[in-house]
Amino acid sequence: MTEKPISLSDYQQKVDDWIKEYGVRYFSELTNTAILMEEVGELARLMARKYGDQSFKKGENEASQLADEMADVLWVLTCLANQTGVNLEEAVKANFEKKTTRDASRHKNNPKL
């Protein structure tokens, strides 16, 4: 049986429930911002090794790391959204509309693309 995809709102709630049950409380917003930067750095390191010019170090294994690092970034970003009262589902919809309006022909008319 396959699980039903999870909405951003449901994900935000699941993260909040997990924090309250297992994490005791959220770290401060500043601490979570620093943790987010750390997680983005880990993702960047993996991207540089997998798609860039760096090679993996002896003993490093890239299998499934990319998805895990992206999920770590999403987790901490969701914690910050929960802490600051941002509804990610609404924010993503509004951001998509903004980009569509602003960039309706911008990329199509870009000779570099």
Question: What are the language-model segments listed below?
Answer:
Residues M1-M70, L74-L113:
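Flexible "arm" and connector segments at domain edges
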